[in-house]
Design a protein with these regions (language model features):
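Conserved alpha/beta-hydrolase catalytic His-Asp/Glu region
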Residues: 195-264
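Flexible "cap/lid" loop of the alpha/beta hydrolase fold
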Residues: 156-202
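Conserved hydrolase catalytic core segment
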Residues: 130-175
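Catalytic histidine-centered segment of alpha/beta-hydrolase-like enzymes
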Residues: 280, 303-317
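Alpha/beta-hydrolase fold catalytic core
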Residues: 1-68, 90-92, 129, 320, ...
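Short beta-strand/loop motif that positions the catalytic acidic residue
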Residues: 266, 272-274
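Active-site loop/oxyanion-hole signature of alpha/beta-hydrolase fold enzymes
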Residues: 95-139, 143, 317
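Conserved HGGG/HGGXW glycine-rich cap/lid loop of the alpha/beta-hydrolase fold
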Residues: 58-106, 123
Length: 330
């Protein structure tokens, strides 16, 4: 092998191992914001519900304060709430829940959103939490809707639905006709294949995280371009760690989601958050969702699907205004 080829192989190897760094730098802004990380919790552990699903939870903040329960989105974990945790932890009791097959929760037994909502009701009973404010992002918002309209209807003070649709997720996103046409012949079989072959997809996910290819997709799927490189790598790393069979199972669960007939049953204050640059949940769908909620309000932000991280400083103030509104403090 010639010296030139050796240098090419070395360059390829370096790119495969560290490509995420230059790609994240090129795809991100230079804004000076605090890097996301892991904050210590006051207590943590696992709880198992009657469905057979086991959840990892972390609690933070003063334990006698108003509780806010955080439910993350698909292929994320409770770690996505870093900025919200730092902002709200001094004043509120915070509960961070990893969905089964995400973060530190083991694979789920049943990932239907109705089951996850019943599980949430059981978790609130186990933790002796009364009248929480439930804050759901994306998939977490779907569970929040099911909870507030059903098993948690008598044990919820308010809800926050951030970038979360009220019906089949492909109906409230970009290219709905194409995605719906591909769902049964392509996407569902693909997800079933991923569940059966997790080793291959875990390897693929790890390689794509290291070389930065997943950085590219996450930049356009989750952010508007004002995220920092550390934020982009942080979220991509969370996704790379999650078990692919768990993500596939959860994805199949939300493909059967529909709360359009139930949202009128939600009788508590609800803040619906949408974003101008969110390809996953269109702001127009948020307008309809708010119109169906008896106490709904709409906050539209100039951000992407992960505005809770990309523009956390501004968003946390807006969410805090809702949490401290007279409807929730009387």
């Amino acid at each position: 092998m010639t010296a030139k080829n050796q240098w090419k192989l070395l360059a390829l190897g370096l790119f495969m191992a560290f490509g995420r760094y230059p790609i994240s730098w090129l795809m991100s802004s230079n804004r000076k914001v605090r890097k996301p990380g892991i904050l210590p919790s006051k207590s943590r552990g696992h709880l198992t519900c009657s469905s057979g699903n086991t959840y990892y939870l972390e609690l933070d903040g003063p334990q006698d304060a108003q509780a806010i329960v955080f439910l993350h989105g698909l292929n994320a974990s409770g770690l996505q709430w870093y900025y919200q945790r730092a902002y709200f932890r001094k004043k509120y009791k915070l509960v961070f829940i990893d969905t089964p097959g995400h973060g530190k929760s083991p694979l789920g037994r049943n990932m239907a959103t109705e089951v996850l909502a019943r599980d949430l009701s059981e978790l609130m009973e186990m933790l002796a939490i009364r009248n929480p404010i439930v804050y759901g992002h994306s998939m977490g918002g779907m569970v929040t809707m099911k909870y507030a309209a059903g098993p948690g209807r008598d044990n919820v003070k308010g809800i926050i639905l951030q970038h979360s649709g009220f019906t089949h997720p492909f109906k409230t996103t970009q290219f709905p006709k194409t995605l719906l046409a591909l769902e049964h012949p392509v996407l569902r079989p693909y997800l079933a294949f991923a569940k059966r072959h997790p080793v291959f997809f875990r390897f693929l996910s790890t390689i794509n995280y290291l070389n930065g290819l997943s950085i590219l997709s996450y930049r356009y799927l989750l952010f508007s371009g004002e995220q920092t490189a550390s934020q982009l790598r942080f979220m991509t790393r969370i996704a790379a760690i999650n078990p692919p069979e768990g993500i596939a199972d959860a994805f199949l669960g939300i493909l059967d989601f529909d709360a359009s007939a139930e949202i009128k049953k939600i009788s508590v204050p609800a803040l619906v958050i949408s974003a101008d640059h969110d390809p996953i949940f269109l702001p127009e769908a948020a307008d309809y969702l708010v119109s169906q909620l008896s106490m709904g309000s709409h906050l539209r932000v100039d951000s992407g699907h992960l505005s809770l991280m990309e523009h956390a400083v501004e968003l946390n103030v807006m969410v805090n205004n809702f949490v401290e509104s007279p409807d929730l403090t009387d």
